[in-house]
């Protein structure tokens, strides 16, 4: 039964699509049917049920389903073993009766399918021929009801109907009623087309009195004409709804595909009948008049003979009236063929045509005199569905058909013969007709409206018809079948129409129109109002659909009533190789968006990745679950994971397919909402309006998920938490070294500077804090920063070594409030998002601008240093490093800022910009602006990104220890530029110098090696403050210096700062080279520690001129002078690059340059890499 259920769902999903149905959809349905072939009887029954219950526009697609299933089965299993064909043939007659309820324009498609079946021998001719006859209307020449029910007779019936019509006049009332409907239609159409309009006018003038409804005895053509005219006038009001319906059907067919289908099909079928009737009617010109009168008579009969307005619609119950109408129809037959098309057209035109007083009465629909194609209506079944079928467009006639035996009905069906006739009598007739129609209208379907002037009814009807036609046609057909009981039919029609209108759920307006029809007695204004609401309802539906589409694009699941949706942003990635690293997973997912954290579980071969945004997680899941994606040559699986915020009590509500936890409102405590956001987010659309603070909680949730991206303010709060942690670790150790000198410079804004410095730490920490947050204040920091999750993993190795003193701790504690915001923004946006470099962050943030650049520059530098120092301190530093390591989504970018002293200040500046009140030291201000210029600010970030992210984690740690050098002497030496670190750590730079004599360019190394850079950086920092162009140079330092090639003469670079800038690219390359060399000599952990430390310390040294650095510079100055000649040449290009960068910055200020050189020389001696690089550097120094 699973296959049957699958087929059922596939088939009925057609209702969700708009015809025509695509070939791919038909293939899916056919495949589902073939799969369920064992239960082929169920499949056949489902298809038949679909055809029976679907809207008219889906009838033909249902036939195509039968055709596709049978042909595929015959092709796949052979004609002998095909089970579907014989099974469908058992009930095929009833099935085609429902199929012929389709829009009249689709009937040709049904005939085409039958012809193909006959040609290809799908079914026997004995089965197909009756179906073709049914389509032609031949099968039910006698029983109009059948035709109406089947809605099959549109093309062929015309001939038989015409003959029947000819006979009908003499025949009993019922036949007359049937024939008149189509004949009247044709007659009316003809009258409109030809001079009949004038004739009708004359007749109306002559016989303005309402025609005698039951004057079948009127044999004279004049009497017939008069009756036709009067009938038109009276029926126009009574039929307006019907005509409206027919016209509406046509309009809807063309424009409103949703509603029209049913009505259109019915109307078309009726039109076919009408066309056939029209053909017969052509015989007698007076007949049209008579037909009109028949309808009019019918109307008058209800109004005059009997007071039942409803009766008129169905009853034109003057059977006598029908007879006269029929007689008239005979006379009008000549006009009928022409009139049929005309009437249909007129129905369209009638809306505009006021002259057709009756037209207005009917439904303005016929107003447009589209003489064109209403003829088809006549063709359908004049006798059969005369009102409805006879007039394809005239679904409305079907309504009258019951009462009007179809004389009146046909007219409405025809194109509103009544209307058409008014059109015929357009000038004169309309007016007389108008008054008369007023009566017929009441008698007709619009008792209430009828009193209103015909014109008003016309407009009202126009509105109704459009809506009504769809519902009316099917109902009309039914009514025609029940013509004998006009009154009953009328009552039933509204309901049936309603039901049908309901079936086509496409249009609410349709349903409204149906309801209106049933309420014809009520005012049309009401129907109009309903119709007016329908567009609103449709627009509301459209808005709902658009909103749902937006929610799907955002990855949000469906909303359940009174249920809070906690959408997970956590993804589970499984089947990972045990060697898979966090970086591998991050590289897989970071393309989709920022990552908040990654939790690796190697024993299980899986990882839990918390994305910042639900949309990013949704896109990652959609893409990675479709293709065969591999990590380390091993295919992975991905799925939603329950977010951490969902406690065990709520796991029962977890939906793994949608990645959402649906928690009923009564189970949710408002205070728990915030906790739900961990690893997920609250769907604000599903929250109880009574919960207070929910908006904030969602924001927090966003902040937590989005971390830095979401909001800097929140990160700030988390950062303060991290700040306390960092304080113990004191990323400040490096800062401590540099802090004394920097403190004075920062002190210019002492309070702010003090706070800023701690913030500076915090920002640097902020960079780490993201990782840090997860470590120390996991909840707050992680949300603000993406790295937090990752940082813990990477930081430990690099950060443990540097254990700097907590001198900066106070600043950290002080700045936390301010710093967190600033640092967080940079970290989040800069580290992750920009990941490019501190420079970019600093330049963009120019954090300087928001905050006092003067204070900021120092804090940023201090912060980087503190971060590096923090590395030494396991708690904070580890996190800080991790922040870079969180490079998963930009950790390295975070490191990059640390690497470049100017870069670090900029990120801090950015953070400080968050804290505009803070004053920034002049140095920082200068740096900020230079990056701001953009030329350098932009490039450095990018350049830094490329080289730094990889180098940052490993290379910088070495440099970091160098700065931290005071603490870890050996670690410093091991730093990527170990030489410089060692010199600083080892006061006797002579030995180091001996080792790294070629590294006399160590001034440049100092940047790479934090100790020397720290010393040099003070001068550089001074240079920044002293030289206004430092901004550009700083940018170069950050962007180029790190990348600068150390191959060039360190001395030249050191001596010529321009050279240093030129060599910035080389240095960057050399940094990359150094990392490999160092990797060879040192452990990865040491590298990472040094690299992180290095960057931070370089910035710290540059930003802060520490007394130690000054002293070392003094000592090293002598050594540098001695070694300047030989050591520079010997100095390895890598170390030279780092030193050169610093030198160039230092050289910007001559005094600074001098100081830096001594520092560099000790660094050279200290770093063991120097000797390795000596050969290359030796060549350079001679330059």
Curated annotation (Swiss-Prot):
Compositionally skewed regions (Basic and acidic residues) per UniProt: 488-498, 538-553, 1047-1122
GO MF annotation list: RNA binding; RNA polymerase II C-terminal domain phosphoserine binding
Superkingdom in the source lineage: Eukaryota
Biased composition (Basic residues): 499-536
Protein name in UniProt: SR-related and CTD-associated factor 4
Pfam families hit by this protein: CID, RRM_1
Sequence ranges assigned to domain RRM in this UniProt record: 569-643
Composition skew (Pro residues), residue ranges: 367-380, 399-410, 429-440, 800-823, 920-952
CDD domains: CID_SFRS15_SCAF4, RRM_SCAF4
PTM-bearing positions, type Phosphoserine: 154, 717, 1042
GO CC annotation terms, alphabetical: nucleoplasm; nucleus
Biased composition range(s): Low complexity: 381-398, 411-428, 1006-1020
Compositional bias per record (Polar residues), positions renumbered to this chain: 457-469, 1136-1145
Subunit structure: Interacts with POLR2A; via C-terminal heptapeptide repeat domain (CTD) phosphorylated at 'Ser-2' and 'Ser-5'.
Organism for this UniProt entry: Mus musculus (Mouse)
GO biological process, one term: negative regulation of termination of RNA polymerase II transcription, poly(A)-coupled
Gene that encodes the chain: Scaf4
Region of interest: Disordered: 299-324, 348-561, 691-722, 800-858, 920-1183
Keywords: Acetylation, Methylation, Nucleus, Phosphoprotein, RNA-binding, Transcription, Transcription regulation
Main location per the UniProt record: nucleus
Domain CID: from-to ranges: 1-139
PROSITE patterns: CID, RRM
Subcellular compartments: Nucleus
Entry-annotated residues carrying N6-acetyllysine: 49
Function: Anti-terminator protein required to prevent early mRNA termination during transcription. Together with SCAF8, acts by suppressing the use of early, alternative poly(A) sites, thereby preventing the accumulation of non-functional truncated proteins. Mechanistically, associates with the phosphorylated C-terminal heptapeptide repeat domain (CTD) of the largest RNA polymerase II subunit (POLR2A), and subsequently binds nascent RNA upstream of early polyadenylation sites to prevent premature mRNA transcript cleavage and polyadenylation.
Alphabetical list of InterPro entries matching this protein: CID_dom (IPR006569), ENTH_VHS (IPR008942), Nucleotide-bd_a/b_plait_sf (IPR012677), RBD_domain_sf (IPR035979), RRM_dom (IPR000504), SCAF4_RRM (IPR034369), SR-CTD_assoc_factor (IPR051485)
């Amino acid at each position: 039964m699973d296959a049957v259920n699958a087929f059922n769902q596939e088939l009925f999903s057609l209702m969700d699509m708009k015809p025509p149905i695509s070939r791919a959809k038909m293939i899916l349905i056919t495949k589902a049917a073939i799969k369920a072939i064992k239960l082929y009887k169920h499949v056949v029954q489902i298809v038949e049920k679909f055809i029976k219950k679907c809207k008219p526009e889906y009838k033909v697609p249902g036939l195509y389903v039968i055709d596709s299933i049978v042909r595929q089965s015959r092709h796949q299993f052979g004609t002998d073993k095909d089970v579907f064909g014989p099974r469908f043939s058992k009930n095929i007659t009833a099935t085609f009766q429902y199929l012929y309820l389709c829009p009249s324009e689709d009937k040709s498609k049904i005939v085409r399918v039958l012809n193909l079946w006959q040609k290809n021998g799908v079914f026997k001719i004995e089965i197909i021929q009756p179906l073709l006859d049914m389509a032609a209307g031949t099968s039910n020449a006698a029983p109009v009801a059948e035709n109406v029910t089947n809605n099959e007779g549109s093309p062929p019936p015309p001939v038989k109907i015409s003959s029947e019509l000819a006979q009908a006049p003499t025949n009993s009332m019922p036949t007359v009623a049937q024939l008149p409907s189509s004949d009247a239609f044709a007659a009316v159409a003809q009258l409109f087309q030809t001079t009949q309009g004038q004739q009708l006018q004359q007749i109306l003038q002559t016989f303005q009195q309402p025609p005698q409804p039951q004057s079948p005895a009127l044999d004279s053509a004049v009497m017939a004409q008069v009756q036709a005219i009067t009938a038109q006038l009276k029926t126009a009001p009574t039929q307006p709804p019907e005509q409206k319906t027919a016209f509406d059907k046509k309009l809807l067919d063309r424009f409103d595909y949703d509603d029209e289908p049913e009505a259109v099909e019915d109307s078309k079928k009726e039109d076919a009948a009408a066309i056939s009737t029209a053909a017969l009617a052509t015989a007698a010109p007076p007949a049209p008049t008579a037909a009109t009168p028949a309808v009019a008579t019918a109307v008058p009969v209800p109004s005059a003979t009997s007071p039942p307005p409803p009766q008129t619609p169905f009853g034109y119950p003057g059977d006598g009236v029908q007879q006269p109408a029929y007689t008239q129809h005979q006379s009008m037959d000549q006009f009928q063929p022409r009139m049929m098309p005309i009437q249909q057209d007129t129905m369209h035109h009638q809306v505009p045509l006021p002259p057709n007083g009756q037209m207005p009465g009917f439904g303005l629909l016929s107003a447009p005199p589209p003489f064109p194609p209403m003829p088809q209506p006549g063709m359908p079944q004049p006798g059969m569905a005369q009102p409805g079928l006879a007039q394809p467009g005239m679904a409305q006639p079907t309504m009258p058909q019951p009462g009007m035996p179809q004389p009146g009905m046909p007219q409405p069906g025809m194109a509103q013969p009544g209307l058409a006739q008014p059109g015929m009598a357009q000038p004169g007739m309309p007016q007389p007709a108008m008054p008369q129609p007023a009566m017929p209208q009441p008698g007709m379907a619009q008792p209430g409206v009828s009193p209103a002037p015909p014109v008003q009814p016309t407009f009202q009807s126009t509105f109704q018809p459009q809506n009504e036609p769809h519902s009316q046609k099917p109902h009309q057909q039914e009514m025609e079948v029940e013509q004998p009981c006009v009154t009953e039919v009328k009552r039933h029609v509204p309901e049936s129409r309603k039901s049908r209108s309901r079936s086509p759920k496409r249009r609410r307006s349709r349903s409204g129109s149906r309801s209106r029809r049933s309420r014809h007695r009520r005012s049309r204004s009401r129907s109009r109002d309903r119709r007016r609401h329908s567009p609103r309802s449709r627009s509301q539906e459209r808005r709902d659909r658009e909103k749902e589409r937006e929610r799907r694009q955002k990855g949000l699941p469906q909303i359940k009533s009174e249920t809070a949706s906690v959408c997970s942003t956590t993804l589970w990635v499984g089947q990972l190789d045990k060697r898979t690293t966090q970086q591998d997973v991050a590289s897989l997912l970071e393309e989709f968006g920022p990552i908040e954290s990654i939790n690796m579980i190697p024993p299980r071969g899986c990882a839990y990745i918390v994305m910042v945004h639900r949309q990013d997680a949704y896109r990652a899941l959609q893409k990675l679950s479709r293709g065969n994606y591999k990590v380390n040559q091993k295919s992975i699986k991905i799925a939603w994971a329950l977010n951490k915020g969902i406690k065990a009590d709520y796991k029962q509500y977890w939906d793994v397919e949608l990645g959402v936890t649906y928690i009923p409102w009564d189970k949710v405590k408002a205070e728990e909402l915030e906790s739900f956001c961990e690893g997920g987010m609250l769907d604000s659309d599903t929250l109880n309006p009574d919960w207070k603070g929910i908006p904030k909680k969602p924001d927090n949730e966003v902040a937590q998920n989005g971390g830095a991206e979401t909001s800097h303010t929140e990160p700030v709060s988390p950062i303060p938490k991290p700040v306390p942690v960092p304080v113990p670790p004191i990323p400040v150790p490096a800062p401590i070294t540099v802090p004394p000198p920097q403190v004075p410079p920062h002190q210019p804004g002492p309070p702010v500077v003090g706070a800023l410095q701690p913030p500076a730490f915090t920002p640097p920490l902020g960079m780490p804090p993201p990782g840090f947050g997860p470590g120390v204040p996991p909840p707050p920091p992680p949300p603000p920063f993406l790295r937090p999750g990752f940082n813990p993993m990477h930081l430990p190795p690099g950060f443990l070594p540097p254990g700097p003193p907590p001198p900066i701790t106070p600043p950290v504690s002080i700045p936390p409030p301010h710093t967190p915001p600033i640092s967080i923004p940079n970290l989040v946006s800069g580290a992750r998002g920009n990941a490019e470099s501190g420079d970019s962050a600093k330049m963009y943030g120019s954090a300087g601008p928001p905050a006092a650049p003067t204070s900021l520059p120092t804090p940023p530098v201090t912060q980087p240093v503190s971060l590096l120092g923090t590395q030494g301190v396991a708690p904070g530093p580890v996190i800080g490093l991790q922040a870079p390591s969180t490079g998963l989504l930009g950790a390295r970018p975070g490191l990059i800022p640390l690497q470049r002293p100017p870069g670090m200040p900029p990120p801090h500046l950015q953070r400080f910009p968050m804290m505009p009140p803070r004053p920034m030291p002049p140095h920082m201000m200068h740096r900020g602006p230079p990056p701001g210029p953009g030329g350098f600010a932009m490039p450095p970030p990018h350049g830094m990104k490329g080289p730094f992210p990889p180098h940052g984690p490993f290379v910088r740690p070495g440099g970091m220890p160098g700065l931290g050098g005071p603490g870890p002497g050996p670690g410093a030496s091991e730093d990527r530029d170990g030489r410089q670190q060692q010199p600083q750590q080892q006061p006797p730079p002579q030995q180091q110098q001996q080792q790294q004599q070629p590294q006399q360019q160590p001034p440049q190394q100092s940047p790479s090696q934090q100790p020397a850079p720290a010393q040099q950086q003070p001068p550089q920092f001074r240079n920044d403050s002293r030289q206004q162009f430092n901004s550009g140079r700083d940018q170069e330092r950050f962007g180029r210096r790190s990348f600068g090639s150390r191959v060039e003469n360190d001395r030249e670079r050191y001596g010529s700062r321009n050279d240093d800038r030129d060599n910035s690219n080389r240095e960057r390359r050399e940094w990359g080279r150094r990392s490999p060399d160092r990797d060879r000599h040192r452990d990865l952990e040491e590298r990472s520690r040094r690299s992180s430390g290095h960057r931070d310390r370089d910035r710290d040294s540059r930003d802060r001129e520490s007394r130690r650095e000054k002293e070392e510079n003094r000592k090293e100055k002598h050594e540098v002078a001695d070694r300047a000649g030989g050591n520079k040449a010997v100095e390895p290009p890598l170390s030279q690059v780092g030193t050169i960068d610093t030198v160039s910055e230092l050289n910007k200020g001559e005094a600074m340059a001098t100081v830096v050189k001594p520092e560099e020389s000790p660094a050279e001696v200290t770093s063991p890499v120097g000797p390795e690089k000596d050969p290359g550097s030796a060549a350079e120094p001679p330059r």
